[in-house]
């Protein structure tokens, strides 16, 4: 699919001006811009939350494996003592 031509863009712009009026267009653009900004911010925060959850899970796994190693070493040393 090819991008719209200049003529098509001008017709779309004219329809928008007729529907909303010239005074409302800056307000609509501002609202659209802030909406996009908020969406990007939410996506970034979600990615950061997911990353921190992954880091926490990996830290828990590392701690569990260390605890298992310590427990195994302790059990082995008790067996050697008897």
Swiss-Prot record:
Single GO cellular component term? TAT protein transport complex
Main localization category: membrane
Stretch list, region Disordered: 42-82
**Basic and acidic residues: which segments have biased composition?**
63-82
Q: Which subcellular locations apply to this protein? A: Cell inner membrane
Membrane topology, as annotated, equals: Single-pass membrane protein
Please list every transmembrane segment annotated in the UniProt record, as residue ranges. Answer: 1-21
**Subunit structure of this chain's protein:** The Tat system comprises two distinct complexes: a TatABC complex, containing multiple copies of TatA, TatB and TatC subunits, and a separate TatA complex, containing only TatA subunits. Substrates initially bind to the TatABC complex, which probably triggers association of the separate TatA complex to form the active translocon.
Q: What does this protein do?
A: Part of the twin-arginine translocation (Tat) system that transports large folded proteins containing a characteristic twin-arginine motif in their signal peptide across membranes. TatA could form the protein-conducting channel of the Tat system.
- Recorded protein name is Sec-independent protein translocase protein TatA
Query: Organism source for this protein?
Result: Helicobacter hepaticus (strain ATCC 51449 / 3B1)
What lineage does the source organism belong to?
Bacteria, Pseudomonadati, Campylobacterota, Epsilonproteobacteria, Campylobacterales
Q: Which gene encodes it?
A: tatA
């Amino acid at each position: 699919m090819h991008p719209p031509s200049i003529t098509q863009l001008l017709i779309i712009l004219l329809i928008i001006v007729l529907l909303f009026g010239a005074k409302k267009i800056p307000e609509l653009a501002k609202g659209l811009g802030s909406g996009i900004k908020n969406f990007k911010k939410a996506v970034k925060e979600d990615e950061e939350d997911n990353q921190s959850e992954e880091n926490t899970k990996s830290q828990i796994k590392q701690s569990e494996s260390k605890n298992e190693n310590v427990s195994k070493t302790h059990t082995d040393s008790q067996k050697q003592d008897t």
